[in-house]
């Protein structure tokens, strides 16, 4: 059973780990006792930041990579690129993650560029976002520009690419380790290539680098007969625990994991299966504990527009997708904040996301948040919480599927690992 000892930030919310560790474990025990087969490719630097498991906080802080949560002071970040963004082919896994009104768009433009003028405006917005981050004292890194329209073929499928816009989807930083997620969309199979120059540099400078087992993405990974004719069908299926991805092999996107020190919260989604969560659980054990949480509407592609932990014991919980375990957080003393209804216009294209990108914010520290300049309601909410808002307009960038949290991957945050284990 978990016992709490907070190293920093007080004890607010820390007890939630005890509750979730004891309550959620009950529903997952049967699953984790099965014998899963997984592989991993982990690299160890010639001069690693951590020579053993008992490395000091000082040693870890000297690494180019160090981040334990979503709110410690941000020092370095990767920001994605919209350049050459390509519409993914309209395959079954894409259909399961997009809204019905956009299906004709994918059927018509799959394998082609997203609207050029829209991407141009998104590029300008993200450049401004980078400038603002630099002004706030954050080091900004960018992935490579790649031609995503090139068709590729594996023994199991063929596809074109998509983009390198959302580093949060593919990279998860846990302490001094960068984990490359395997992904679940065929159009994103080679997305890691855009980030390899950066990752290799971090590795040479001492960071740990792990690549999760790459799925074949064979037909068996997907329910080819997933019965979705409308969004309502999809919501009902997901609520029953039926997703387009099967348990044929591990798959997950990094954006389905939310970090809070030694405890990491994950959801089973259309792109993250239980095998993928189990791989992560085994890989991070015993130093970190992965907890599965679930929601009334489990269909959204990633967790960070549903459940966003923005401080120690402080969480944004989407009112349209309430967390089934939210009372456990409340009983533990967490402050649960319900964000206001988003203000994004109905006629603004959101090809692979919902309006709730308004809560997909990036914390620069516990008292500063990067938020969309158009979302005045949520700005007021943050101000009432005593959090200063840094306003940037990324409406066109939203159309490509992400808010500030999605468009970034924090590489370094100045802080220490909180201990939650006995």
UniProtKB/Swiss-Prot annotation:
Highest taxon of the lineage: Eukaryota
Catalytic residues, chain numbering: 253, 302, 406 (amidino-cysteine intermediate)
Catalytic reactions on record: L-arginine + glycine = guanidinoacetate + L-ornithine
Cellular component terms (Gene Ontology): mitochondrial inner membrane
Pathway(s) the chain acts in: Amine and polyamine biosynthesis; creatine biosynthesis; creatine from L-arginine and glycine: step 1/2
Transit peptide per record: 1-37
Keyword Protein biosynthesis: no
InterPro entries: AmidinoTrfase
An MF annotation (GO) of this entry: glycine amidinotransferase activity
Keyword terms, alphabetized: Membrane, Mitochondrion, Mitochondrion inner membrane, Transferase, Transit peptide
CDD domains: amidinotransferase_AGAT-like
The protein's Enzyme Commission number: 2.1.4.1
A GO BP annotation: creatine biosynthetic process
Subcellular location(s) of the protein: Mitochondrion inner membrane
Assembly and binders: Homodimer.
Name the record gives this protein: Glycine amidinotransferase, mitochondrial
């Amino acid at each position: 059973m978990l016992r709490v000892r907070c190293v920093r930030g007080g004890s607010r919310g820390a007890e939630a780990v005890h509750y979730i560790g004891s309550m959620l474990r009950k529903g997952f025990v049967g699953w984790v006792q099965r014998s899963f087969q997984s592989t991993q490719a982990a690299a160890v630097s010639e001069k690693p930041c951590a020579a053993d498991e008992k490395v000091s906080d000082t040693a870890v802080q000297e690494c180019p990579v160090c981040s334990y949560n979503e709110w410690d002071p941000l020092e370095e970040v990767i920001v994605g690129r919209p350049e050459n963004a390509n519409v993914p082919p309209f395959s079954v896994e894409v259909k399961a993650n997009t809204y019905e009104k956009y299906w004709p768009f994918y059927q018509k433009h799959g394998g082609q560029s997203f609207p050029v003028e829209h991407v141009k405006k998104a590029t300008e917005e993200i450049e401004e976002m980078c400038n603002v981050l630099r002004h706030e004292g954050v080091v900004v890194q960018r992935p490579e520009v790649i031609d995503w329209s090139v068709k590729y073929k594996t023994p199991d499928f063929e596809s074109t690419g998509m983009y390198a816009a959302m580093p949060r989807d593919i990279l998860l930083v846990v302490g001094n380790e960068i984990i490359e997620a395997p992904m679940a969309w065929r159009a994103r199979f080679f997305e890691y290539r855009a980030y390899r120059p950066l990752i290799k540099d971090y590795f040479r400078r001492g960071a740990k680098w792990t690549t999760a087992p790459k799925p074949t993405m064979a037909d068996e990974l997907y329910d080819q007969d997933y019965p979705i004719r409308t969004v309502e069908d999809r919501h009902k299926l997901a609520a029953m625990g039926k997703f387009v991805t099967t348990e044929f092999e591990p798959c997950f996107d990094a954006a389905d994991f939310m970090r809070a020190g030694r405890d990491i919260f994950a959801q089973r989604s259309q792109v993250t299966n239980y095998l993928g969560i189990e791989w992560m659980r085994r890989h991070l054990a015993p130093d970190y504990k992965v907890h599965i949480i679930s929601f009334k509407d489990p269909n959204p592609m990633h967790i960070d527009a549903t459940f966003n932990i923005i401080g120690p014991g402080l969480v944004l919980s989407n009112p349209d997708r309430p967390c089934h375990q939210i009372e456990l957080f409340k009983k533990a003393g967490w402050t649960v904040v319900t964000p206001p209804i988003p203000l994004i216009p109905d006629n603004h294209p959101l090809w692979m996301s919902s309006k709730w990108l308004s809560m997909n914010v990036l914390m620069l520290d516990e008292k500063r948040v990067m938020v969309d300049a158009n979302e005045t309601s949520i700005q007021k909410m943050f101000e009432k919480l005593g959090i200063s808002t840094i306003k940037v307009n990324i409406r066109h960038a939203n159309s490509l599927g992400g808010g500030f949290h999605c468009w970034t991957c924090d590489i370094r945050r100045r802080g220490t690992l909180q201990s939650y284990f006995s």
